[in-house]
Amino acid sequence: MINDILEPGLRVVFCGINPGKSSAHTGFHFAHPGNRFWKVIHLAGFTDRQLKPEEERHLLDTRCGITKLVERPTVQANEVDVKELHEGGRNLIKKIEDFQPDALAVLGKKAYEQAFSQRGVKWGKQKLKIGKTEIWVLPNPSGLNRASLDKLVEAYRELDDALVARGR
């Protein structure tokens, strides 16, 4: 099992879909060498250097956290079924209510739509909130996602810029 990186007072909690096999094996989030998460959050301004997966706890120093919708590891996120995502959405709401970060960034549009029973979702800030927590939907940084590094960084930077503009 991969532990959440959470505490009260965070700027943002990044929510992946579920652990891949590399992450399950190492015990660290976004551990597959092809996953661009650590590079993207650095280039977008969330961290002052590119962290390694085994340094994930240092995210708390930057007031960032990580969780996931589904605990079960798979080779690909499309192996997670809708029932698991619905349950994961309910569990995620409880976590966010407990920790109340400024923003929740769900990494994947389809996963967000299924977990929160939403349709026609656009990238970026959502109308739906969890208490005071804004919800953002950002592209998944998996190497299987065809989005370019520049597009990923641009999407994540939009969130960072919005938080900075709010003094967060």
Swiss-Prot record:
SUPFAM superfamilies: Uracil-DNA glycosylase-like. Excises ethenocytosine and uracil, which can arise by alkylation or deamination of cytosine, respectively, from the corresponding mispairs with guanine in ds-DNA. It is capable of hydrolyzing the carbon-nitrogen bond between the sugar-phosphate backbone of the DNA and the mispaired base. The complementary strand guanine functions in substrate recognition. Required for DNA damage lesion repair in stationary-phase cells. GO terms for cellular component: cytoplasm. Keywords: Cytoplasm, DNA damage, DNA excision, DNA repair, DNA-binding, Hydrolase. One of its GO terms (biological process) is base-excision repair, AP site formation. The keyword Cytoplasm applies. It comes from Cronobacter sakazakii (strain ATCC BAA-894). Belongs to the uracil-DNA glycosylase (UDG) superfamily. TDG/mug family. The keyword Heme does not apply. GO terms for molecular function: DNA binding; pyrimidine-specific mismatch base pair DNA N-glycosylase activity; uracil DNA N-glycosylase activity. It catalyses: Specifically hydrolyzes mismatched double-stranded DNA and polynucleotides, releasing free uracil. It is found in: Cytoplasm. InterPro entries: MUG/TDG, MUG_bact, Uracil-DNA_glycosylase-like, Uracil-DNA_glycosylase-like_sf. Binds DNA as a monomer. NCBIfam families: PRK10201.1. Its EC number is 3.2.2.28. This is G/U mismatch-specific DNA glycosylase.
